UniProtKB/Swiss-Prot annotation:
It is a multi-pass membrane protein. GO terms for molecular function: spermidine transmembrane transporter activity; spermine transmembrane transporter activity. InterPro entries: MFS, MFS_dom, MFS_trans_sf. The keyword NAD does not apply. This is Multidrug transporter TPO1_1. PROSITE patterns: MFS (PS50850). It comes from Candida glabrata (strain ATCC 2001 / BCRC 20586 / JCM 3761 / NBRC 0622 / NRRL Y-65 / CBS 138) (Yeast). Disruption phenotype: Leads to intracellular accumulation of clotrimazole and increases the susceptibility to clotrimazole but also to other imidazoles such as miconazole, ketoconazole, and tioconazole; as well as triazoles such as itraconazole and fluconazole. Also increases susceptibility to other antifungal drug families such as the polyene amphotericin B, the pyrimide analog flucytosine, the fungicide mancozeb, and the polyamine spermine. Decreases virulence in a Galleria mellonella model of infection. The lineage of its organism: Eukaryota, Fungi, Dikarya, Ascomycota, Saccharomycotina. Pfam families: MFS_1. GO terms for biological process: cellular response to oxidative stress; putrescine transport.
Length: 567
C-alpha cells in the first residue's frame, strides 16, 4: 500500500519516494533551515521523521514538530496534574508524579547507517527476499488462470456450460480487489511479515480445499476465498520493496514484481494443459497447493520484517526486556487500526476520486483494459491454436511468446528507469509525466500485436501458425509496457493521496480482469477471430494518444486539480 502523506510533502522527500505503488517512512534527512542550533535541531527532526509511522495521527506529528522547533521542554516539577476526575489507584497507592515528555524515550534508527534499517541490509539478504516474494507473486497469479485448463473437464463432470465453469477464474480475480482494502492497512499497522505469512498459509489451504471439493458450489466458494486470502502480495510486496530499496534501485525491483504478476497467468496454461491432459482437473489445484506450501515455508523462513515503524517496535520491545525500563517505546506502538479511516481511504475516497479526477479515470481505464486483455488472451489462445490450427497436445506453447515479449519489455523499462532518475535529478523534483515515455512506444506496439494475432489466426489454413505466435510477443511487450508506467504515473501524480488512487485503479482493474474471460468465448466465436481482434485493436489504437496528451497537458491538469500532486 502507498501511504498517504501530507500535501506539504517537500520536493526532497518526494525524490526519495518510491516509483512503485508503495511508500514508507522516509530516509533520514538532514535538516536545512536558518534556525539556531541547526545541527541539534536537524538531529531531532531526523529522528522524528524516521520514527513517525504513516498511520500515526497528523495532529500528534504536528505537535511533536512544534515542540522541537520552539525548543519547548516540559519540566515535570512545574506541571500540575489534576487527578480529581480520576478513579483511585487502588490499594491506597498514590497517584504517580508528572512524567517527562513521552517523545524523549522513543527509539529510532541510529543514523542513516543503522544495520537494522532495511536499506543497510546486505545485498544477499535483499536478493533472497526479493526472489522469494517474486515467486510468491507468480504463484498467486498462476492460481488465477490455471483453473481455466480444467474448464472442459468441469463442464463435462458437472454438466454446465463453459461460461459457468470459467466463473472459477472470475471469482478468484474479484478477490484481488480486496488487496488494497484489507492487506495494505493491516501491513501498515502490524507489519509486512505477519500479513504475508498468514496469506501464504491461507492461500495454500484453499488450493487444497478446491482440489477436494465435491460439488461446483464448493469449488466456486473456495476459489473466491483463495483469491481473497492470497491477494496480500499484490499490495504488500511493492511496499516491502520500497522498505528495502532506495529510489535508485526501487523502480527496477518493482519491474520484477510486475513481471511476476503478468508472467504467472501466462505460464499457468502451459503447465495446466499438460497436467489436465494426463490427470484430472483436481491436480491443477494440488500442484498449485504444493507450490504455495513450499513458498509458505520459504516466506516464513527467509522474510524478515521490512516495515520501518514495526522494526522500531521490535527494537523497543527488546530494549525493554533487557533493561526492564518500561519507558522505552516506539511511536508506532500507539497506533491503532481505525476501521472508519480505512473505509475512507480505501473505499469512499477512491470511488469519489475516480469520478472527479479525469486524469485518474482515463489512465485507469487504459490500465484496466490492458489487464482485461491479459485474461481475455487465456480464452483467445485455445480458440486460435487448438480449434483453428488443431494443436491438441501442445496448444498452450504459443503462450511462451507472450512471456518473451514481457521479458524484452522489462529490459526496456529498466533502461528508461535510469533515464527517469537523470530527469528527476536534473529537475530537482518528481516528474510524473516522464513515466509515460516508454508507454508511448508500448501503446503503438500493443494494437499492432492484437490485430496481427487475430487476423493471422483467422486464416489457419492459409497462414502458418508462427505468424500469430510471433504476434504474441508484441502483445506481451504492450501489456507490460503500458501497465507499469500507468501505475507509476498514478502514484506520482497523486502522491498525497496515492493509496486512494491506487485503490481506485485496483478496483476497476480487477473488475476488467474478472469480466473479460466471461465474454471472450462468445465474442471470438460469434464475431470471428479477425473481427473480434479488429474491435479490440481499434479500441487499443484509440488509446494511443493518452500518454501523448498527458505528456503535453498532464502538468497543467495536475496544477488545477485539488487532489493531484504538483510541486
Amino acid at each position: 500500500m502507498v501511504e498517504e502523506i501530507s500535501p506539504k510533502y517537500t520536493n526532497e522527500q518526494a525524490e526519495a519516494s518510491s516509483s512503485s505503488s508503495s511508500s514508507v517512512s522516509g530516509e533520514p534527512k538532514d535538516f536545512s533551515g536558518s534556525l539556531e542550533n541547526q545541527e541539534d535541531l536537524g538531529e531531532l527532526i531526523e529522528r522524528t521523521n524516521t520514527m513517525t509511522s504513516g498511520a500515526e495521527s497528523k495532529v500528534e506529528t504536528n505537535r511533536r514538530m512544534s515542540r522541537i522547533l520552539t525548543g519547548t521542554q516540559d519540566d515535570p516539577e512545574k506541571i500540575a496534574i489534576d487527578y480529581s476526575n480520576c478513579p483511585p489507584m487502588g490499594g491506597d497507592r498514590p497517584f504517580p508524579p508528572a512524567l517527562p515528555e513521552q517523545s524523549q524515550f522513543e527509539v529510532t534508527f541510529d543514523g542513516p547507517n543503522d544495520p537494522i534499517h532495511p536499506f543497510n541490509w546486505s545485498m544477499k539478504t535483499k536478493t533472497i527476499i526479493c526472489i522469494v516474494l517474486c515467486l510468491n507473486c507468480i504463484c498467486i497469479s498462476m492460481g488465477s488462470s490455471i483453473f481455466a485448463s480444467g474448464v472442459p473437464q468441469i463442464c463435462k463432470i458437472y454438466h454446465v456450460i463453459p461460461v459457468v465453469a470459467i466463473l472459477g477464474v472470475t471469482l478468484y480475480v474479484f478477490g484481488f480487489a480486496a488487496s488494497p482494502v484489507i492487506y495494505a492497512p493491516l501491513s501498515e499497522v502490524y507489519g509486512r511479515r505477519g500479513v504475508l505469512v498468514i496469506s501464504a498459509f491461507g492461500f495454500a489451504v484453499f488450493q487444497f480445499a478446491v482440489a477436494t471439493s465435491k460439488d461446483l458450489q464448493s469449488i466456486m466458494i473456495c476459489r473466491f476465498f483463495g483469491g481473497l486470502i492470497g491477494a496480500a502480495p499484490m499490495a504488500v510486496v511493492p511496499a516491502a520493496f520500497a522498505d528495502m530499496f532506495d529510489v535508485r534501485v526501487r523502480g527496477k525491483a518493482i519491474c520484477l514484481f510486475s513481471l511476476g504478476v503478468f508472467v504467472g497467468p501466462i505460464l499457468s496454461p502451459v503447465m495446466g494443459s499438460y497436467i489436465a491432459q494426463r490427470t484430472t482437473w483436481r491436480w491443477l489445484e494440488y500442484v498449485t497447493g504444493c507450490f504455495a506450501s513450499a513458498l509458505f515455508v520459504a516466506v516464513a523462513l527467509t522474510f524478515k520484517e521490512t516495515h520501518h515503524p514495526t522494526i522500531l517496535v521490535q527494537k523497543a520491545k527488546e530494549m525493554r526486556k533487557s533493561t526492564n525500563n518500561w519507558g522505552i517505546h516506539a511511536a508506532h506502538e500507539h497506533v491503532e487500526l481505525s476501521v472508519s479511516e480505512i473505509a475512507k481511504k480505501t473505499i469512499t475516497r477512491p470511488i469519489k476520486m475516480l469520478f472527479t479526477e479525469p486524469l485518474l479515470l482515463i489512465i485507469t481505464i487504459y490500465n484496466s483494459f490492458v489487464y482485461g486483455i491479459l485474461y481475455l488472451m487465456l480464452e483467445a489462445y485455445p480458440i486460435v491454436f487448438v480449434e483453428g490450427y488443431g494443436f491438441e497436445a501442445n496448444g498452450e506453447l504459443p503462450y511462451i511468446a507472450l512471456i518473451i515479449g514481457m521479458l524484452v519489455c522489462t529490459a526496456f523499462l529498466w533502461y528508461f528507469e535510469n533515464d527517469y532518475l537523470k530527469r528527476i535529478q536534473k529537475a530537482g523534483k518528481l516528474v510524473p509525466e516522464a513515466r509515460l515515455i516508454p508507454m508511448v512506444y508500448a501503446g503503438v506496439i500493443f494494437p499492432i500485436g492484437i490485430l496481427w494475432f487475430c487476423w493471422t489466426g483467422y486464416y489457419p489454413h492459409k497462414i502458418h501458425w508462427m505468424c500469430p505466435t510471433v504476434a504474441g510477443s508484441f502483445i506481451g511487450f504492450g501489456l507490460m509496457g503500458i501497465f507499469l508506467p500507468c501505475l507509476n504515473y498514478i502514484i506520482e501524480s497523486y502522491l498525497p493521496l496515492a493509496a486512494s488512487a491506487v485503490a481506485a485503479n485496483t478496483f476497476m482493474r480487477s473488475a476488467f480482469g474478472a469480466v473479460f474471460p466471461l465474454f471472450a468465448g462468445y465474442m471470438f466465436h460469434g464475431m470471428g477471430t479477425g473481427w473480434a481482434g479488429l474491435l479490440l485493436g481499434l479500441f487499443a489504437a484509440a488509446l494511443i494518444p493518452v500518454p501523448l496528451f498527458f505528456l503535453k497537458y498532464g502538468e497543467r491538469i495536475r496544477k488545477n486539480s485539488k487532489d493531484a500532486y504538483y510541486a
